[in-house]
């Protein structure tokens, strides 16, 4: 469990977590939001609310391009709102206009995880449309090759490990505090 003195984090603006599925955006994001005393928002949940359909249904009915267009609109709305910890879908940061919005209104943090960890964390999950057809390991490797160069544009790069969620959250907090100190950002 996280100790009380380690349970604080002042965010000057929305913290946007990016990375592949299984990197820990949701689990770590919830703990960071608790530390910062701000809401945790899962962009995928907000997309499902806006569409009144699951992500899998959106993909199946409308295809990936329509999903990405909806994702961009929802991200713009969320970034214009109050400060929060925002977990994005794995592909959200790939869109240049979304990255520009994040640069303007948020602080991006890439949760970088190795292939074995991603495979272990996503095994048997059926709510991930991009992994439902074919070999998940191969698909994740392809996504890593395509997305990692773009994810590297994030303000902060954090290496996710196979450790407890509390341990990861504390390490992310340490990275954030160092980044904020180095960049002289303070909470409003």
UniProtKB/Swiss-Prot annotation:
Entry cofactors: Mg(2+)
Residue numbers binding Mg(2+): 26
Annotated positions binding ATP: 22-27, 128
GO CC annotation terms, alphabetical: cytosol
GO molecular function per UniProt: ATP binding; magnesium ion binding; shikimate kinase activity
Chief location of this protein within or outside the cell: cytoplasm
Pathway annotation: Metabolic intermediate biosynthesis; chorismate biosynthesis; chorismate from D-erythrose 4-phosphate and phosphoenolpyruvate: step 5/7
SUPFAM superfamilies with a match to the protein in the record: P-loop containing nucleoside triphosphate hydrolases
UniProt binding sites for substrate: 44, 68, 90, 147
Its EC number(s): 2.7.1.71
Keywords: Amino-acid biosynthesis, Aromatic amino acid biosynthesis, ATP-binding, Cytoplasm, Kinase, Magnesium, Metal-binding, Nucleotide-binding, Transferase
Catalytic activity: shikimate + ATP = 3-phosphoshikimate + ADP + H(+)
Record note on cofactor: Binds 1 Mg(2+) ion per subunit.
GO BP: amino acid biosynthetic process; aromatic amino acid family biosynthetic process; chorismate biosynthetic process
Classification via Gene3D superfamilies: P-loop containing nucleotide triphosphate hydrolases
Pfam families on file: SKI
Function: Catalyzes the specific phosphorylation of the 3-hydroxyl group of shikimic acid using ATP as a cosubstrate.
Assembly notes: Monomer.
Cited PANTHER family: SHIKIMATE KINASE (PTHR21087), SHIKIMATE KINASE 1, CHLOROPLASTIC (PTHR21087:SF16)
NCBIfam families: PRK13946.1 (NF010552)
Family affiliation: Belongs to the shikimate kinase family.
Protein's name according to its UniProt entry: Shikimate kinase
Species in which this protein is naturally found: Rhodospirillum rubrum (strain ATCC 11170 / ATH 1.1.1 / DSM 467 / LMG 4362 / NCIMB 8255 / S1)
Gene that encodes the chain: aroK
């Amino acid at each position: 469990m996280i100790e009380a003195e380690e349970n604080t984090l002042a965010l000057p603006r929305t913290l946007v977590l990016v990375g592949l599925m299984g990197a820990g955006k949701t689990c770590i994001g919830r703990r960071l939001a608790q530390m910062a005393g701000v809401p945790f928002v899962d962009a995928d949940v907000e997309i499902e609310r806006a569409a009144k359909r699951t992500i899998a249904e959106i993909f199946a009915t409308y295809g990936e391009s329509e999903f990405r267009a909806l994702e961009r609109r929802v991200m713009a709305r969320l970034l214009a709102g109050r400060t929060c910890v925002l977990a994005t879908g794995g592909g959200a940061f790939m869109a240049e206009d979304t990255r520009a919005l994040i640069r303007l209104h948020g602080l991006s943090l890439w949760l970088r995880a190795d292939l074995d960890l991603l495979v272990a964390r996503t095994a048997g999950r059926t709510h991930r449309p991009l992994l439902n057809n074919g070999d998940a390991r191969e698909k994740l490797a392809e996504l890593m090759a395509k997305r990692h160069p773009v994810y590297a544009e994030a303000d902060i790069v954090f290496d996710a490990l196979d450790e407890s969620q509390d341990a990861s959250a504390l390490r992310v907090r340490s990275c954030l505090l160092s980044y904020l100190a180095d960049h002289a950002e303070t909470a409003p």
